[in-house]
């Protein structure tokens, strides 16, 4: 008996018992079993390998050599990986290993989401969970606080299995006899061995890690390997709906095959939770397999105590078939993977013929959508009353929170209803109601209330954009009693499901993807030999040269200018654009002083009723500019936005200059404008772009050219960009704020007069003209002011602007600052 006893560490490795004698056949040489180590040609008759007789090899080198040979044998011969061989191990090391084996606890978890708690759920925790479920519903945070010893993720994971088991069993209560009838009890009368073997077992083990990976477990399921036999045995017949899977192997030997099946022997006792008993619910209650109906097959080899259990009973096979039909997330075993007297041959066949893509078979939770019938008529809601259905659907406002009160819920709900009355029958999106609900809660909270009102038909009734299908969680238990309660419960679940992120699965190549992306695909499963043969055939084939024209450097030019399209009767302007004289003056001033592109923000307002965008102010910004492109400095952009907000304006657009070429957007400008439009449209706002060209060589007039544009959804014929459309701009008949324009002019002059791209304002701006750059600027400003004020005030203001420029640029010339390069650019 002493020679047969062996200790199993948490990796499944076999260590000779401390009581074994050196001459009893349990020496180190006997551990090298013939079927689990190298081919016979690699060793001598007595089983020893020649290199093991060399005493000069250190223990470290010996271990490295063993590992290399094991890996070579595993990958080349496709045999099962053997147990780790412990050579010349000291007795104190063995005792230390034995102590670790008896106290070790492992948690089996999904490799993508490691759980942080390995203790099984106690009866008290389960009772507290049920109390919290009855009191708080599916509020996992509150239930976690009630339990105290479990995190929110652990409570959620336990609840998933709890509801799943209730759905499988069909009844909330089940007698202990019914529960124990789902387990198969295997007894060895000679040694008193008992093993409760669940009919749904399939495991995978990694020999290099102290964790046993179980396929088809949920993310937070746990497996404990412990020696607490009495405690587990006492709790087995009691209520046990936990998702924890507990394995107990005290002082036993465990062989594990390459595919992950466990072959146990000696005195071992394995207890499993009832998470796997759901696949036996179709069996009769009194159908219990006795120990006489199951034969225990034991094989003893001369050099070791290797035992296997063969389950040959016909009823057991039928139960296995029933389990294979089960589609839950339990642990599933195939009948073809049961242990047999020749485990290595079975492993080889499985290696050659089977490729498991559990993730492709929808191991992850399915995200099916449950259709909700669209409301038949629009619902009128009393603005002063909160119905019970609203409290069930949006419970966060009725839990006594300081920030989320029923009064705040009324404010949000009634504001959304008011906005719907204004924009009816146009679709009311979530972002359009956010500006009027500042300091009323986060975006998701407002979105959930909007979704609830849309689902019940209070808003967006009859709109095509209204969506009545929401992703639904899998583990939801349906309430069948009251129809109204069912509808409210389902609605609440849809709203809660919006908080959870979409689960992903792995494709056959190991890449993360959406589960729906794998639907309708067929994968070809090839063995290693077939795959290698196909690769050799592909190498032998001549490579066909694809005659694809090489793209030239100019095939895609981000600075290519795209002419704007014009709105017509077929495609009308989405809104009108009106620009104040103050904004035109500042844009002209800013664009004239630099031969590099300048940039800034436009502030104003948008009237939804009149469909008019009013550009009231222009705020210059610092630019991160090169000779070819211009981007807005983030810090300066933030400051400009705050300046416009102080004046009561919203950011409704941006402007930049094309100093000496046409005011048409480049491909880069189109991309930038499209991104701005997409961002601001989420809140229901409008966003325009303006381009100022002061020194365009193709423009015979001294006035600047200005283009106001938006980017449409239409795609160009070659599919490389979206089409820009140009607005007809109207000037607003309001006098500018003279002092503000003068201060902006002073800031612009101080910033650009010493820059390398500064324009010499006293030089001729073009060869065929007598006007200097400053005189040209004054002509542009005079034209703008002629429509909003009398000529005397305009001339007085222009004189002050001219004196400001002359004083600054005269001092520059005295300091020796020349602008020859910019002059050449202007004259060209």
From Swiss-Prot:
Stretches for region Disordered: 1-31
Induction data: By DNA from viral infection and intracellular DNA.
Subcellular location: Nucleus; Cytoplasm
GO molecular function: DNA binding; histone binding; histone H2A deubiquitinase activity; metal ion binding; metal-dependent deubiquitinase activity; transcription coactivator activity
Effect of residue 669 to N: Abolishes H2A deubiquitination
Every MPN domain range: 577-709
Modified residues (Phosphothreonine): 236
Annotated SMART domains: JAB_MPN, SANT
EC nos: 3.4.19.-
Chain residue numbers at which the record places covalent cross-link Glycyl lysine isopeptide (Lys-Gly) (interchain with G-Cter in SUMO2): 187
Gene Ontology terms describing biological process: chromatin remodeling; immune system process; pigmentation; positive regulation of transcription by RNA polymerase II; proteolysis; regulation of cell migration; regulation of hair follicle development; regulation of hemopoiesis
Annotated motif JAMM motif, positions: 656-669
Keyword annotations from UniProtKB, A to Z: Activator, Chromatin regulator, Cytoplasm, Disease variant, DNA-binding, Hydrolase, Immunity, Isopeptide bond, Metal-binding, Metalloprotease, Nucleus, Phosphoprotein, Protease, Transcription, Transcription regulation, Ubl conjugation, Ubl conjugation pathway, Zinc
Domain of life: Eukaryota
Sequence motif LXXLL motif, location on chain: 774-778
GO cellular component: cytoplasm; nucleolus; nucleoplasm; nucleus; protein-containing complex
Pfam families: JAB, Myb_DNA-binding, SWIRM
Record: disease: Bone marrow failure syndrome 4: A form of bone marrow failure syndrome, a heterogeneous group of life-threatening disorders characterized by hematopoietic defects in association with a range of variable extra-hematopoietic manifestations. BMFS4 is characterized by early-onset anemia, leukopenia, decreased B cells, and developmental aberrations including facial dysmorphism, mild skeletal anomalies, and neurodevelopmental delay. BMFS4 inheritance is autosomal recessive.
Quaternary structure and partners: Component of a large chromatin remodeling complex, at least composed of MYSM1, PCAF, RBM10 and KIF11/TRIP5. Binds histones. Interacts with NFIL3; this interaction is critical for their correct recruitment to the ID2 locus during natural killer cell maturation.
Description of its domains: Contains an N-terminal SANT domain that mediates histone/DNA binding, a central SWIRM domain to mediate interaction with chromatin associated proteins, and a C-terminal MPN domain that contains the metalloprotease activity.
Protein family per UniProt: Belongs to the peptidase M67A family. MYSM1 subfamily.
Protein name (Swiss-Prot/TrEMBL): Deubiquitinase MYSM1
Taxonomic classification: Eukaryota, Metazoa, Chordata, Craniata, Vertebrata
